[in-house]
Amino acid sequence: MMEKGIWKDALIQSTKKLSPKLQVKNPVMLLVYVGAILATSLYFLGFFGISDEKSGYTLAIALILWFTVLFANFAEAIAEGRGRAQADSLKMARKDVLARKLKNIDDKTDVIEIASNDLKKGDIVYVLANEQIPMDGEVIEGAASVDESAITGESAPVIRESGGDRSAVTGGTTLVSDWLVVRVTAVSGESFLDKMIAMVEGASRKKTPNEIALQILLVTLSIIFLAVSATLLPFTEFASKQAGAGSAISITNVIALLVCLAPTTIGALLSSIGIAGMSRLNQANVLAMSGRAIEAAGDVDVLLLDKTGTITLGNRKASEFLPVDGVTEQELADAAQLSSIADETAEGRSIVVLAKERFDIRGRDFAEMHAEFVPFTATTRMSGIDYQENTIRKGAADAVRAYVTANGGTYPKECDAIVSKVAGAGGTPLVVVRNNKVLGVIYLKDIVKNGVKERFLDLRKMGIKTIMITGDNPMTAAAIAAEAGVDDFLAEATPEAKLELIREYQREGHLVAMTGDGTNDAPALAQADVAVAMNTGTQAAKEAGNMVDLDSSPTKLIDIVRIGKQLLMTRGALTTFSVANDLAKYFAIIPVLFYGIFPQLEALNLMGLTSPTSAILSAIIYNAVIIIILIPLSLKGVKYREMPAGKLLSRNMLIYGLGGLIAPFIAIKLIDMLLTVLGIV
């Protein structure tokens, strides 16, 4: 399951974690730790005749308690070891390299060689093929293939280019081809790689609110059992005198009984469950900024999903030019290409390519034309070009209609019919207007991904509502939403509309998750309970999110929710198992322990345990061994199934609740029989 090196390191760390400074961080296991020290002290006192405690029996109890503490340490060390192994591979990617810092962005020969660790935010660097990108940054010029395998594990190179949503590059990755001009967005020690190493090593892991709440419950239970166990010594002493039979319970037995009754199973595994949950997220190539974000993912009941890349394939391409009456297709194609020349999105480039392929329309001298490009914004929802007293705009139908009307023009009804036809087919219509005259529509074709409908059905079974977010018009959005099977959609989405939608659901008590990659997504990402920023996205988006997806796959949000739910389920299942164990051990041990004083209790010794000594030893051995048995489950997590929360709870209560009640009875009896056969008791 794991490399030998991790096992070996975990064994060493288990011993190092016996330090009181580390043990005090886990109050439940601190109780076992103190009990082991007391039992060891009683053994030595008995060995030298200072105490009446049985030396051999006390030594056995002391050793088992020490092993219980070591097993708990081992569980945590294994989980941490996995993180360290991942961090070590990341550290190999983080090394100081020489960077070419440009003095002037227009002159790529005028460079200063500088160590990557000395780079500052805003510096411009020039990176060539086969060179390592020195620091996190944003591509401002060029396009190149980048090998990101050191960080993502994905061997296939990816394209990084200026403009659009693939402009972010990460320090430590390598250029495979071409060149890039990069603006540095982070300094040494604060880079994405540095943050990732800190997270996977657990250096910045803090206990989550749910962990703290559960630990308070476990400590409360431990204090109650401590109080109960402490009263047994005077109670049994008084009872034995009154009954004239039996003897007072020994201090060793009080310690052993306390450890058996305290919720040590979940206390030992709680930390490893949290660390393993974060590790599973890291293995999915997602970096969580805090454990709180993972827990929130488990409680999410509303998902906001971008249409492009999540529900559809994301590579919308221009497939047709649909002119209005009185306009030729070539005339529309020419205007569409001009409006898209400076558009660095995949859609914009596809328009340029389609115009070239259909009508052999080539580039022109824009300096001579005195052209001024108008970039797309989320507010105007249009882009275009101004040249030689000509104005061309392309954009969403309603945005273009408002633009034409505001400038005194007429928006033809025929265009509405074309837009409706394209939208009804699930495509995206872009209307082109020149000098306030509508020329026609560009048909951008989009394809719904295979299997998404089934995934959304699974989410619905889990009680999660899915909402598609798109900038498309309502007709296009409705067609794609129906085909994909989402519960609702937000069409013609603006940053403000997304933000308000999140706030509306949060006011109703829902937890909301979303993905984003652009600067315009930052406000909504900052507001969402679970905000997954794409690694290729802008720096603003990454800073606003509480998770970063290294693969930049919007569909990863569904997997993140599943991992979050699995973490909460694992913690809940093992807590249920631990508490059920305590109840079973109570009813297994107490009758045997006291039937010397109260013979009537022998009738409750249903398992027929040999003696009080055997009962205590069997229970405390089981208490230690069950921790080791459950370590793989705490690391791997309880298997998650897509079903309603009520059914899932009933299923887990049956498996881990009932299982937790039955397992101790069977195991303790088997251990008791083994101890008797071996002649130990």
Curated annotation (Swiss-Prot):
Keywords: ATP-binding, Cell membrane, Ion transport, Magnesium, Membrane, Metal-binding, Nucleotide-binding, Phosphoprotein, Potassium, Potassium transport, Translocase, Transmembrane, Transmembrane helix, Transport. One of its GO terms (cellular component) is plasma membrane. SUPFAM superfamilies: Calcium ATPase, transduction domain A (SSF81653), Calcium ATPase, transmembrane domain M (SSF81665), HAD-like (SSF56784), Metal cation-transporting ATPase, ATP-binding domain N (SSF81660). One of its GO terms (molecular function) is P-type potassium transmembrane transporter activity. It holds the Pfam family Hydrolase. ATP binds at residues 343, 347, 376-383, 394. Gene3D superfamilies: Calcium-transporting ATPase, cytoplasmic domain N, Calcium-transporting ATPase, cytoplasmic transduction domain A, HAD superfamily/HAD-like. Mg(2+) binds at residues 517, 521. The chain crosses the membrane at residues 30-50, 59-79, 216-236, 255-275, 587-607, 615-635, 661-681. Its main location: membrane. The active site is at residue 306. It is found in: Cell membrane. Belongs to the cation transport ATPase (P-type) (TC 3.A.3) family. Type IA subfamily. This is Potassium-transporting ATPase ATP-binding subunit. It comes from Listeria monocytogenes serotype 4b (strain CLIP80459). The lineage of its organism: Bacteria, Bacillati, Bacillota, Bacilli, Bacillales.
